[in-house]
């Protein structure tokens, strides 16, 4: 498996680093059939639907030409292209999750190469859509004139674009296969590492089982008595510690209660002393105020009696 993985990576890198100018694509005869697209992954099935629709467009039948004058063909192709690229991204994300155990450098390089192949496929689709839109504009501009030359030129462009689309799709398919091979190898490596980690634990479990079997050969009554004595000793020790703690807590509570009563008595005496002191301060002042008030009332009464006129004096006046 590792040898296959290395061979695939070397082949892929050699194809990426080659800087040879692409050869001109040979003209395909009108009656010559191009190879079919095959695949079982969701993105391959989506691309197959796009491939079949493009083959129907390439026939340039009367129905195709009629729909080319509208936007229906462009809309259908756009929907199929978006579906294909969506499935490619989903499949790539799934492989990236499986590729996590592989080295970071290798994973980054493969991801970059895969993105480049994916971008080329998207460019081919965009060129195809632009070519059809350009043809529609040219036909609409030549209404009432013969369009045989435009149709033949479109057929030639479609054959070339379809061939380039197939080439880039196969390239993407190969890179995804390399990506998947790396994911499988990473998964196998993770399983091996997990097996190495679990090996000592399994051995310890086996030894523990053997020890338990040896202990099981002893008489059950002896083991029960030994466990009972240990449990009794532990319970007695716990009870003794609990009793000591209760005695200490009782003593502490008595000390706290005595201190509280003492402080309460001191506060009561201080309050009584302060009350008596306040009374001694204010009692003379209150008595003096009472005397002054009584004298003031008496003077007011005398003034009132002295200023009241007699009846005879009032009459003479």
Curated annotation (Swiss-Prot):
Provenance organism: Camelus dromedarius (Dromedary)
Annotated stretches, region: LDL and other lipoprotein receptors binding: 157-167
Keyword Transport among UniProt keywords: yes
Biological role: APOE is an apolipoprotein, a protein associating with lipid particles, that mainly functions in lipoprotein-mediated lipid transport between organs via the plasma and interstitial fluids. APOE is a core component of plasma lipoproteins and is involved in their production, conversion and clearance. Apolipoproteins are amphipathic molecules that interact both with lipids of the lipoprotein particle core and the aqueous environment of the plasma.
Lineage: Eukaryota, Metazoa, Chordata, Craniata, Vertebrata
Chain positions covered by the region annotation Lipid-binding and lipoprotein association: 209-289
Gene Ontology CC annotation, any one: low-density lipoprotein particle
Quaternary structure and partners: Homotetramer. May interact with ABCA1; functionally associated with ABCA1 in the biogenesis of HDLs. May interact with APP/A4 amyloid-beta peptide; the interaction is extremely stable in vitro but its physiological significance is unclear. May interact with MAPT. May interact with MAP2. In the cerebrospinal fluid, interacts with secreted SORL1. Interacts with PMEL; this allows the loading of PMEL luminal fragment on ILVs to induce fibril nucleation.
Glycosylation: residue positions: 211, 310
Region of interest: 8 X 22 AA approximate tandem repeats: 79-254
UniProt family annotation: Belongs to the apolipoprotein A1/A4/E family.
Claim: Transport is one of the keywords in the record: yes
Residue stretches of each Sequence repeat: 79-100, 101-122, 123-144, 145-166, 167-188, 189-210, 211-232, 233-254
A single GO BP: lipoprotein biosynthetic process
Modified-residue entries (Methionine sulfoxide), positions: 142
Signal peptide start and end residues: 1-18
Keywords of this entry: Chylomicron, Endosome, Extracellular matrix, Glycoprotein, HDL, Heparin-binding, Lipid transport, Lipid-binding, Oxidation, Phosphoprotein, Repeat, Secreted, Signal, Transport, VLDL
GO molecular function: cholesterol transfer activity; heparan sulfate proteoglycan binding; heparin binding; identical protein binding; low-density lipoprotein particle receptor binding; phosphatidylcholine-sterol O-acyltransferase activator activity; phospholipid binding
Main location: secreted
Disulfide bonds listed in the record: none
Official protein name in the record: Apolipoprotein E
UniProt-annotated stretches for the region Specificity for association with VLDL: 277-289
